[in-house]
């Protein structure tokens, strides 16, 4: 019983401002170069994706996501039109700075034995975390970012991994590797020594990496360049959107329901609303 209209563009919502509160009562749609007004008996549902394909909105709300070299993924029409339409009638948009950013460094699983370090040679996360959580932490670091591995754990990385991160350096010792990566003197060695002590007692008190993935880094070493923009593949999409009740009713800035207006999908800020907590 659904009347599907193709090649029709929703332009704006129709608002009835009479009475104690505004109500969405319809929609203006352009079809065949002509505007048509449609009455919505029960309401309008905005379900038009996020804004990952809108460079202007990304720059305004989530510049960290598009921080050089990351790759937007989604429908080409994820341009934020539904979110903006809801905002135009007072809908509250929340968590617009949040997004899912993947660091698809496994498979092979052996890469999880390594450690991520930032431009100061410091570790910043447990490497057995969900790849989206790692991505969220990675873009907040001082660049460059490297994944430090034993060469024996490199295995079939070149054929099995989606990451495509280039080799940034190799070394028989940590000092050799750090010099090639131009990291602060002594920083990488201190980080790896701390990590290896955690491996000895099978307890990562800093980031709580689990036992099966705790393995000594004892060389020879290889470093993968995981800096966005330097060759690695980092896909992302947005998580922010219109604030709604559990029934999908859009809320205004005061937290009051806008009657007759609903949002769903990425147009709404749904259950997965933070990059560091997203999982699929």
Please state what every model-predicted region is:
Residues 1-280:
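Residues forming the flavin
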């Amino acid at each position: 019983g659904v009347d599907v209209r193709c090649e029709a563009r929703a332009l704006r919502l129709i608002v009835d401002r009479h009475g104690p509160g505004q109500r969405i009562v319809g929609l203006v749609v352009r079809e065949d170069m002509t505007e048509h007004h449609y009455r919505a008996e029960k309401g309008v549902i905005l379900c038009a994706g996020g804004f990952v394909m809108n460079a202007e909105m990304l720059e305004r709300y989530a510049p960290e996501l598009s921080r050089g070299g990351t790759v937007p993924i989604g429908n080409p029409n994820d341009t934020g039109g539904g979110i903006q339409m809801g905002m135009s009638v007072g809908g509250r948009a929340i968590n617009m700075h949040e997004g899912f950013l993947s660091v698809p460094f496994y498979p092979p699983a052996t890469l999880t034995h390594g450690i991520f370090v930032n431009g100061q040679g410091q570790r910043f996360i447990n490497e057995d975390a969900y790849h989206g959580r790692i991505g969220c932490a990675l873009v907040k670091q001082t660049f460059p970012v490297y994944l430090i591995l034993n060469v024996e754990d490199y295995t079939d990385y070149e054929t099995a991994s989606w990451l495509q991160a280039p080799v940034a350096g190799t070394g028989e010792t940590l000092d050799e590797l750090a010099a090639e990566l131009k990291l602060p003197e002594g920083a990488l060695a201190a980080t790896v020594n701390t990590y290896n002590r955690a491996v000895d007692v099978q307890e990562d008190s800093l980031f709580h990496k689990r036992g099966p993935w705790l393995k000594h880094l004892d060389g020879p070493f290889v470093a993968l360049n995981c800096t966005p923009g330097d060759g690695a593949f980092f896909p992302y999409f947005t998580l922010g959107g219109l604030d709604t009740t559990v029934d999908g009713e859009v809320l205004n800035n005061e937290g009051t329901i806008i009657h007759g207006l609903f949002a769903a999908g990425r147009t709404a800020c749904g259950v997965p609303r933070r990059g560091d907590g997203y999982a699929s």
